[in-house]
Structure formats: structure tokens, C-alpha cells
Amino acid sequence: MPQNTHVEMADIEAARIAQEKKEPAADFAALRKNAEEVSRCLAWNPSVHASRFFSARWKAMAATLRPVLEKVGRAKRKQPEPDDLRWLRENLHLLWAQLWNTRNAFKQLPRLPHVLTPRGTTIPRAAAVAEAYLYAAEFDFSHASFTAYIGAFQESTTLKFRELWALIPAMELALLEQITARSRNVFDETQPSQSIGICIRSLIEINQLHWKEVLEPQIAFDQILRQDPSGTYPRMDFESRNLYREKLVLTAERSDSTEMEVAGQALELARQAQQTPSDDPRMALRESHVGFYLVGAGSNELRERIGFHPSLAHKIRSLLRRHPDEFYLPGIEILTFGLMSLIVLLLTSTVTSPALILLSMLVLLLPCSQSAVQLMNYLTTALLRPEVLPKFDFSKDIPEDCTTLVAVPALLLNEKQVRRLVENLEVRFLGNHNRNLHFALLTDLPDSPVPSREDDPLVDLCGNLIKELNEKYSGKQMGTFLMLHRHRIYNPREKV
């Protein structure tokens, strides 16, 4: 159970660890058992959704750690130098950077579930789990032990999507608190070593770890989405999968269902669509994809199932997406008229003649309309933010069912230019080796006052160069080269 609710508690724990004979923290069975016990001890507090827990803890820690780091930076190096002081001196820049990075990370944390600890305090569950893991591992972080601990914890208590990502800054804060507590007597050579190096090494490991690969397998509802009947979701890249997960989380937060239930309903809808006969196979494939109900046209069907309660902002965005023309064009007209009217009212009086007012509005029409267009563009991008387009992950290979042709359009002007076009095509090929990736020149001849010849020398040259490329790389089982030429028909009326 996490005990370090204050830096002072971390100080006590540091002294205890320094006095005890430590054993290697590689006993994953003990870690799993501890995770199960912590899971049973933490009681969810549904009445608390946000708190100043992280900011208060950071301020208390920073107030103590900053003077220590400043003193270490000013102190002259001595020989021999205590291990703790050496660790602080050699990693001074890292600790300063980590101090401010952690504060910035807490500013970006969303509302997190809170739990009631056995000591009667209410803290974010992510903080409780992070501290419990580090204490169980004796602050010696490793990828394997962290994965084992979180996996065991989630066997009885499922962490939400945002909680998993909050574990990273929560662990960094706990480690900084330990460094703060253990460094208070770092200049006292009579004091025993406090093993500051373990905490700093763990901080370095956390910063160097590829967290996308570590946390994605821990997302509980992600395993449901990977059962996508269309087989599309597992083949997508991380950013696209994360887009789906973010949409699912936002939907769950505004509904009567949990993240797991929303994922289950999306999967059920996709399976029902797969079993329903359809005359359009392409549409049937789309509707059998879980993304169709998370980010696509089927999202309303999913929201009806889970009891979605849209916010006012969501209603406005949905209305704008359904009626873009009715929003954009009339908006420009209204803003143009409003700007013109405002300027005319400020520059005229009750004795100004109507003809002069009309002339002023005509003069202001062009600049006001330009300003209105810019303002509408800003409002549109502010209300409807761009999103990642879902895409497949072809970083390792392009499967046969996604065979791709890269077509380069070009005009054939002269022999030198044709040879350069083919050379550039070969360069593209050499930078993208794949048996299912093919390259083509989409060629045409420039306009001419006379009909084009059937045996144009530039066309023949380009075709021969493409043929030579195919022969050159024929034995390497990679993509092929093509030339797709458009034979133009002479138009007597236009004389081209």
C-alpha cells in the first residue's frame, strides 16, 4: 500500500531502506501478490473526480529539492566523493529538466478516478498504483517488473485509459520525492549512503522507455477492439489506433457505460453488420469495422446503445459537420455585413446622407469580406479541429491485399529530362524495397499544333529505359516498373 503521501514519509522510508539489507527486486511473484493486495485495499471514491493532489505534492517536493540541486551545482568536487553526491552532480541537468517536465505533465493530466486509501486519504488511483509499485520494487524500475505489476493489478481492477498514461508522471514524482528525501544529508560524510543512484537510474529508464509499446498491451478495452471482424484495427498504425481509443474514452465519459462496455458494444455492432447480407461488399466491409461506430457514420448508432449524453459543444460540432455549407457561407455574409455596419456606425452620424452611407458600404465591402473569410476560417478550425486520418501500418511490410502503385505524372519534353525522370523513379524504388510496391511514370506529350506521331522518339526512349529497369531488378523479387502513356488525339477546332 502506498505510504509516501508527503515528502517526510519518503524521508522515513529512505532511512529504513538504507539500514536494511536489500535483496534484488526481481521477485515478480511477490510483486504480483503486492499488486493484488493493493487492488483490494483501494476503494473507489465516485464523488471525487479532480483534486490538487499532484500540484501540491510537486510544490512540496520542489521547495526542498531545488536548494539541494543549487548547492550541488555550486559545491566544489572533492576526492574521494560520496556516491550519492556523485550521482547528483553527474545528473544535475537531468534532475532540473525532470523537475520542470513533471510539473508540465501534471498540468496536462485530465480528470482521474480517485480512491480512498486505508489511511483515509483520497488520492488519484494512478498515484496510488505508481507509488505502490515503486515501493514494492524498492524504487528499482524495470520494464518487466512494471508490466508484471500492472498486469496483476488489472486482474481485479481495470485501470482507465487515461490512468495508464498518468502512471508515468506519477512515478517520476515519487522518484523525485525519494531523491529529495535521500539527499538531505548528502553533504554529511558521516551519514551512510542512501542509494540515490537507484532512483536516478530508474528516472533515466523511465525517460528512455518506449511507452507506446509498454502501455498499449495494458489497455484493457484494446484487446476487445483487436477482435475487429474486418481485421482492420490490428493492422493500423499506433496513431490511428490511439485516435479510436481517444474517441472511445470521450464517448464513455459522456455515457452511462464504461470503456469496456463501449468497446464491447462497438464490437457487437460490427459483428452484426458482418452477418447481415449486403449488395455492396465495400460498404459491408466498412460497417463490419469497429471504427465505423467509433469515428465514422455509425457513431450515432453506438451512442444510442450506450446512453450517450452529448454536451453543448458536442451538439454544436455535430450540427456544423452535418451542415457545413449552411454554416460557412452564411457566416461569411453575416460577418461581412456586421463589420461593414459597425464601421459605418462609428464613422457616420445622424446627419450623414444615405448616399454617402451607401457609398461607404460599397467601399468597405471588399476589405470587410476578406476579414470575414479569415475570421470564419479561424472559427472553423477552432470549433472543428483536424484529426488524424486512420491508416494502415506499412512500416514493416505491404501485404498482398494492399498492393500499391506509385504513379509519377510527367510531360516528356526532351531526352535529358526523360532520362532524369527514369533515374528519379529508380531512386524512389531503391528507397522503398517491397515486392508489393510498384512504380510507374504517367506520361504525356506537351501541346502541339500538329498531330502527335505514333512512334514518338521520346515515348520509345522512356519505354526502353523502363524496360531496362525491369530487367536490372528482375531477380530481386521486388516491385516492377511501368510506363503509362496517354496517346493524345488532335483537336482540329482548338488546333492542339
Describe each region flagged by the PLM.
Residues 2-4, 11, 41-44, 48, ...:
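Basic/hydrophobic alpha-helical interface regions
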Residues 20-120, 148, 165, 479-495:
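ATP-dependent phospho-/nucleotidyl transfer catalytic cores
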Residues 122-164, 171-185:
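Active-site activation/catalytic loop segments of kinase-like enzymes and analogous catalytic loops
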Residues 127-131, 147-151, 177, 314, ...:
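Feature representing long, continuous alpha-helical segments
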Residues 169-178, 317-377:
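Alpha-helical bilayer-embedded segments of polytopic membrane proteins, i.e.
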Residues 187, 346-349, 371-393, 419:
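Juxtamembrane/interface segments at transmembrane-helix termini
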Residues 190-318, 387-496:
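Internal catalytic domains of large membrane-associated glycosyltransferases
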Residues 353-379, 383-387, 445-450, 457-469:
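Carboxylate/His-rich catalytic cores and anion/metal-binding grooves
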